[in-house]
Amino acid sequence: MAKQAIKRAKILAVKNNNKIGVLLINLGTPDEPSVPAVRRYLRQFLSDPKVIDVPSLVRWIIVHLCILPFRPKRSAKLYQKIWMPEGSPLLVYSEMLRERVGETLGDDFCVALGMRYGKPSIETALKKLQEAQCRQLIVLPLFPQYSTSTTASALEGVRAKNSFKEMTVIDRFFEEPHYIDSMTTLIHENLNEFQPDYFLFSYHGLPERHLVKSGCQLAICNRKNNCSPISSSNENCYRAQCFETSRLIAKKLNLTDQQYGVAFQSRLGRAKWIEPYTDKYLIELSKKGIKKLMVVCPSFPVDCLETLEEIGIRAQSQWQRLGGETLKLIPSLNAHPQWVNAIAKMAKKSLQLF
């Protein structure tokens, strides 16, 4: 069925000289690691009501009076530690991914990259696909686990600028076999040179209230424990999706429950965020005598500040202070060949939805 749908789509595209557009969306990055550039980026990012979901006046006060006067200077210094000669790692690797996915999909497709915040914008990416005479649009936010502050916000940005009449969306892929296999292969490649005592899957955190707003009917569960397997009661719960991704990867790696754990990083502000917190989890692991730790960040398909600096530098330093021997950060999928093929397969599979 899938092969027939793909064949029909290809024939239609060639017959009408129209391509199928694929829009890859990532979060975004400052233009440069300077205070003004970081301030512009943070202003746009944090002004999104899906990111800081409080009344507009309260959000304005938080952003303009509590964050922007102080955070840009600190964040700029962090970006400077990871900035590449070619530019922001997130942008460099995302562009590399876009190019290779385009090469893999072939001439019947046109692949564009849009950032929810910063450049290239979603609007710019959509214009490129329109100029390429694409008639159908496949939207793939590069966020494996669905959340309102990432996926829903990105899709809102698309709908605000979209003129395509035929559009399909891949709004999550946390349990997609091609994604899980790509993650497993990446980890296996790094196991050839490092054998850890323990695996830690570290995901981007969210305020707990976001889980309730997502419709999770298990909001009363003790969030310090593992989430239940995905069901109709928690299928939109970001935390549950993270645990499901971890379970699937661990199963592929033949790990027992005692060999891996799940934690959440990058919390901001004083609100209650989903637990356990990555930095505190490291403390608990050190108390258990763990010395060699492998950290995997499945919610970040592309390396960025949160992986390279927060884990690769800060968590590494914390681990050494705690008496750990080695903290090995697994690179993000970036433009790994298997991941490129996985995206191409997901895009082709989505053609059945037109």
Swiss-Prot record:
Gene3D superfamilies assigned: 3.40.50.1400
Annotated catalysed reactions: heme b + 2 H(+) = protoporphyrin IX + Fe(2+)
CC annotations in GO: cytoplasm
EC number(s) on file: 4.98.1.1
UniProt entry keywords in alphabetical sequence: Cytoplasm, Heme biosynthesis, Iron, Lyase, Metal-binding, Porphyrin biosynthesis
Chain positions recorded as Fe cation binding sites: 204, 306
The keyword Nucleotide-binding is assigned to this record: no
A GO BP entry: heme biosynthetic process
Pathway assigned in UniProt: Porphyrin-containing compound metabolism; protoheme biosynthesis; protoheme from protoporphyrin-IX: step 1/1
InterPro entries: Ferrochelatase, Ferrochelatase_AS, Ferrochelatase_C, Ferrochelatase_N
Molecular function, one GO term: metal ion binding
Domain of life: Bacteria
NCBIfam families: hemH
Role: Catalyzes the ferrous insertion into protoporphyrin IX.
PANTHER family (UniProt xref): FERROCHELATASE, FERROCHELATASE, MITOCHONDRIAL
Similarity-based family: Belongs to the ferrochelatase family.
Name used for this protein in its record: Ferrochelatase
Primary gene name: hemH
